[in-house]
Amino acid sequence: MKPSIYAFSQANLVDWILENGEKKFRATQIWEWLYRSRVQSFAEMTNLPKSLIEKLEEHFVVNPLKQRIVQESKDGTIKYLFELPDGMLIETVLMHQHYGLSVCVTTQVGCNIGCTFCASGLIPKQRDLTSGEIVAQIMLVQKYLDERNQNERVSHIVVMGIGEPLDNYDNVMTFLRVVNDDKGLAIGARHITVSTSGLAPKIREFAREGVQVNLAVSLHAPNNDLRSSIMRINRKFPIEVLFEAIEDYIKVTNRRVTFEYIMLNEVNDGVEQAQELADLTKNIRKLSYINLIPYNPVSEHDQYSRSTKERTLAFFDVLKKNGVNCVVRQEHGTDIDAACGQLRSNTLKKDREKARARIAAAKAKAGIRA
């Protein structure tokens, strides 16, 4: 299986070009074709010699993804189901925000973090995505926008789709450098947010990368007992270890950290827990922000439901009274398979049902012949 050329940073592409006996400027030409002209084949790179096009076609593909399903919400949110070269499925979401167009990308096929409320973890991690497969999600969404001829551009990225981004660290870092490159897509680093469930050592490493992207931490509980019961990762990196890493990140980068907090009815949404959360973040109040997230129910996790508006507002009020910077996050795509991983999970179910039906039909046909 040929890798995608999107897997290369510009520096990597220059290295490959030189190693293959070509002039350095060819890398710049290829880069501009990929990210400025956004061509989908090497044959469209009309200022390259035929011999170089043949080399590229021999070693790489451009976009490795196939579009399987597109769902569009009434609010303009678009969810894509893409098929990878090995047949695995991933999701990508385009959201219309007041500040621009934001894309949520997936970094792994499945997830091993084991959050008990999440659709992403219904299927264990199969593999990491390559950097090229992550970049390709942005490129296909941008292609979709280009074809609408409304002069729309992906302006923001959230690395919050299926999987744990910091568990696929090297590929995610390459992805960030590709989309941030000012000679390519030129998406500003401060318009990019990487989320983590709390891999403390990787947070420390990320702090020292020198990138200006934003960090979000999926917290979802204010104490170890509760967090360990709903997020398996907390048993490995408990809250005190996680917060030591977060404080180190803030000290090194002087950048704000966002905490994601899904509101689960009568699980983590009490006013006592709001006070615990306020106390937990007290030492980093000036450089932290809390997103309260309405829960998108998942049929396989029917023990959970969305917090009521009353409980959410009471929780929010406690945080505000403690001087916490917080907001109740705007919802997107509530009339489609909104929860992360839900479209993929539902599609896999339907595919299995169709396969069983085909097998049953074949058996019935064989029985008739017999």
UniProtKB/Swiss-Prot annotation:
Its EC number is 2.1.1.192. GO terms for biological process: rRNA base methylation; tRNA methylation. Binds 1 [4Fe-4S] cluster. The cluster is coordinated with 3 cysteines and an exchangeable S-adenosyl-L-methionine. Specifically methylates position 2 of adenine 2503 in 23S rRNA and position 2 of adenine 37 in tRNAs. Residues 97-329 form the Radical SAM core domain. InterPro entries: Aldolase_TIM, Methyltransferase_A, RlmN_N, RNA_MTrfase_RlmN, rRNA_lsu_MTrfase_RlmN/Cfr, rSAM. Signal peptide: none annotated. This is Probable dual-specificity RNA methyltransferase RlmN. The keyword Nucleotide-binding does not apply. GO terms for molecular function: 4 iron, 4 sulfur cluster binding; metal ion binding; rRNA (adenine(2503)-C2-)-methyltransferase activity; rRNA binding; tRNA (adenine(37)-C2)-methyltransferase activity; tRNA binding. The active site is at E91, C340. [4Fe-4S] cluster binds at C111, C115, C118. Keywords: 4Fe-4S, Cytoplasm, Disulfide bond, Iron, Iron-sulfur, Metal-binding, Methyltransferase, rRNA processing, S-adenosyl-L-methionine, Transferase, tRNA processing. The lineage of its organism: Bacteria, Bacillati, Bacillota, Bacilli, Lactobacillales. S-adenosyl-L-methionine binds at G163, E164, S195, S218, L219, H220, N296. One of its GO terms (cellular component) is cytoplasm. The gene is rlmN. It comes from Streptococcus suis (strain 98HAH33). The keyword Ribonucleoprotein does not apply. It is found in: Cytoplasm. It is an enzyme of class 2 (transferase). It catalyses: adenosine(2503) in 23S rRNA + 2 reduced [2Fe-2S]-[ferredoxin] + 2 S-adenosyl-L-methionine = 2-methyladenosine(2503) in 23S rRNA + 5'-deoxyadenosine + L-methionine + 2 oxidized [2Fe-2S]-[ferredoxin] + S-adenosyl-L-homocysteine; adenosine(37) in tRNA + 2 reduced [2Fe-2S]-[ferredoxin] + 2 S-adenosyl-L-methionine = 2-methyladenosine(37) in tRNA + 5'-deoxyadenosine + L-methionine + 2 oxidized [2Fe-2S]-[ferredoxin] + S-adenosyl-L-homocysteine. Its cofactor is [4Fe-4S] cluster. It holds the Pfam family Radical_SAM. Reaction proceeds by a ping-pong mechanism involving intermediate methylation of a conserved cysteine residue. Belongs to the radical SAM superfamily. RlmN family. Disulfide bonds join C104-C340.
